[in-house]
């Protein structure tokens, strides 16, 4: 999203198992990034939860370096945690009729089938809209990153 405007102030959320990005140590660059893990926008018609790029990070460290299944498991867990923290449920909005749109960024094109199969088995449900993108990620030791928009009519 390049720009989002509305009448209500958005609410920002962090993952309690991750250091907020703006508190990252200098190991990751001269200035820490400035984003929240998720932002909830509510109106009279709908609730939208914008989940920032989520990957296999605990604290500020990359988890399961070189282990794609391990990174996928940690990434899925982080998605569940941030959704629960923001009020969309510990199941990443699955049980509460949230429409889910995901972008899945994959470092190595050869991993597409494995990533797709893992998400089909452990995260996705019928009706989810998913786009897989071959892309460079923010850290060289990350193999997959997922961002999402969860929308629920009220």
Task: Report residues per predicted region.
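N-terminal presequence-like segments and the immediate start of the first folded domain
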Residues: 1-154
């Amino acid at each position: 999203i390049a720009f989002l405007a509305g009448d209500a102030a958005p609410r920002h959320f962090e993952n309690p198992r991750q250091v907020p990005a703006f508190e990252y140590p200098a190991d990751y660059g001269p200035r820490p990034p400035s984003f929240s893990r998720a932002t909830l926008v509510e109106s009279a018609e709908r609730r939208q939860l914008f989940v920032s790029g989520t990957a296999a990070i605990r604290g500020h460290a990359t988890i399961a370096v070189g282990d794609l299944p391990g990174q996928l498991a940690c990434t899925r867990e982080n998605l569940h945690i941030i959704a629960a923290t923001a009020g969309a449920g510990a199941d990443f909005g699955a049980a509460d009729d949230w429409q889910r749109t995901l972008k899945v960024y994959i470092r190595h094109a050869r991993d597409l089938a494995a990533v797709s199969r893992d998400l089909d088995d452990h995260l996705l449900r019928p009706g989810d809209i998913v786009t897989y993108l071959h892309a460079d990620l923010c850290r060289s030791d990350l193999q997959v990153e997922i961002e999402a928009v969860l929308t629920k009519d009220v």
